[in-house]
Amino acid sequence: MKFRFPVVIIDEDFRSENISGSGIRALAEAIEKEGAEVLGLTSYGDLTSFAQQSSRAACFILSIDDDELLPYVEGSDGEAPEHAPAIVALRAFMEAVRKRNADIPIFLYGETRTSRHLPNDILRELHGFIHMFEDTPEFVARHVIREAKVYLDALSPPFFKELVKYADEGSYSWHCPGHSGGVAFLKNPLGQMFHQFFGENMLRADVCNAVEELGQLLDHTGPVAASERNAARIFSADHVFFVTNGTSTSNKIVWHATVAPGDIVLVDRNCHKSILHAITMTGAIPVFLTPTRNNFGIIGPIPRDEFKPENIRKKIEANPFAREALAKNPNLKPRILTITQSTYDGVIYNVEMIKDLLGDMLDTLHFDEAWLPHAEFHEFYQDMHAIGAGRPRTKALVFATHSTHKLLAGISQASQIVVQDSEDSAFDRHRFNEAYLMHTSTSPQYAIIASCDVAAAMMEAPGGPALVEESIAEALDFRRAMRKVDAEYGDDWFFQVWGPDELAEEGIGSREDWMLRPNDHWHGFGALAENFNMLDPIKATIVTPGLDVDGEFGDTGIPAAIVTKYLAEHGIIVEKTGLYSFFIMFTIGITKGRWNSMVTELQQFKDDYDNNQPLWRVLPEFVSQHPMYERVGLRDLCQQIHSVYRANDIARLTTEMYLSSMEPAMKPSDAFAKLAHREIDRVPVDELEGRVTSILLTPYPPGIPLLIPGERFNKTIVNYLKFAREFNERFPGFHTDIHGLVGETINGRIEYFVDCVRD
């Protein structure tokens, strides 16, 4: 396949009718005759800005004219001084390009100047000089194209390179999938639409494991294995395993390779539901470490003291099933510790502190870094992620599971398992692969494998660190813009962005700015340990008026669910919505245009709210689905929902239900077995208190399981479910979604139930 990477020529005389313009156009024509595309530009002043687009070029040819340097060279020792405008601009361009791309060829084109006239720091970045009156344009064109081809050929990582080659070769397919490279779609009108939408390349590259030259994902051979080794090098790990069905599966693989029935496991209560599924599947006995929460509903860190071995032992002894296991085997150690790193809202831990606290208490540490795969690539996150360059080994084997599709450039479900060997023993890949095989399809999607490969290779220095720094910079610029807008409104209301009170005025500042210090009011988590936690600045929680971090409601308020519906109807989709906050991420794909659009839409919402615009005008799609709101004003609806939240003190209730005591009545695997054997009762919400759930109960937001199979319903949780029932009935379209809650229509009214273990 021929990729589109033009040769970029930047010369102010490119379109001029003089000898310099004639010479550079002759070179451009010669390059085009060799089959390459040329992009000619005349603006020298925009070089630095254009350098940011170096990812689109095969090489650069930059003009240096005699009349730009001659006034500075005459009377000197022959070298142009540092302050010559041409040198200043050229250096700025070089620095901007090399910050992102160390390898793209750069040529200088001129009349008589040579390397004697340029500083060494510029010379060392060049691939050569092109002199206008020496070699023929045809010869120079071939030389330029050769260098560009060498550069482009080296870009592709192992698996992606072979997949492109295979798709290019046009081999007839006699294996699955049945569409045979997309041909089946061409035989049907609907198939034609599908083919035109996704394109030839995706369908030709959709192959199965019969294509031996691509290697095997299940056995980690060939180009697949080479790509996994390349990713391990880039992520400073000993091993990497690509996973094509998400980090939910990566987590289950780690657990099935480590945990057996009856093992005691230490788990972050804020863990993803896939960890709780793994507990159920493996028959483990979970002992939970409890994170903090603030009144915005933002999940905070587990206090540092909870990681102390003596406190962990107290938790183990307080769990009846763990206590029973210890009675049978007093030497039983917890099998694994799984920590959510980072939380959904961006709170991360100093991992080295955790490792030091635990000592040799565990043999396996697992950090669910679904939301933190970028941390290895910027010093901002030093010690704040599981595995990194120069990090000491511990007595424990360390796993990190990454969603490369969440923060990096992977496509959906692209994930990877990253491993660091313990200091005492090497990791047994063959044993681990037995668990890998249990959870991996024998028909993996090769586009996802290629995505894992490319996403890792894109993070190679210097490009990867530059992408992460750019994300941090854009996130801080967004925060500054929001504060500027708020300041200009004076005493009037506007949205806030949750974070430290002080921001660096320019640049990305210091990571110390983002540390969660003990009792800082802004975070609302109380007396945290010093230097133990940090807020990842690329995660931004936007707070709406109506509730403060102390849990106090204002007289008026704007529930976040209304704001995010408004944004969605204006083409802006957020990641997560809470009661009075919503969450956005500054991934490596975020642009200035995107976050500036967010700022302007929030200002537009303010105007529409202040003017109490009717919902039929500002939320027409929503009103078409829920006509009961047609004549309601935007401000009126906000106040109606706010009044209900306030009357029920819902912020405090949702915080307390997660912090309330959860009584384990059965092992999760035993409770789920009751579900499988149909030994359950479908219990109405009003009768749930004291019953034992057989399922995961997960409210959205925040999407964190509230109860797991085998735990008993308490009064606080039942009160929340009663509130959700009444709220959903009163405000259709703004319903609280709770996974595990079964809705059934009885006598024209929706009633809610939960499947519980039969008494």
Predicted features by range, described:
Residues K2-F5, S20, I24-K33, T42-F60, ...:
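Non-catalytic terminal extensions of PLP-dependent enzymes
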Residues R4-I19, I61, V265-D268:
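Short hydrophobic beta-strand segments
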Residues D11-D13, F60-E68, L289-T292, I542-P545:
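Short loop/turn segments at strand-loop or loop-helix junctions that form parts
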Residues D13-S16, D66, L108-R116, D135-T136, ...:
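Short beta-alpha junction loops
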Residues L41-G45, F50-Q53, S63-D67, P81-E82, ...:
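Conserved PLP-enzyme active-site core in the AAT-like
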Residues N201-T249, V754:
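Conserved N-terminal alpha-helix of the aminotransferase class I/II PLP-enzyme fold
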Residues D238-V240, G262-V265:
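Short active-site oxyanion
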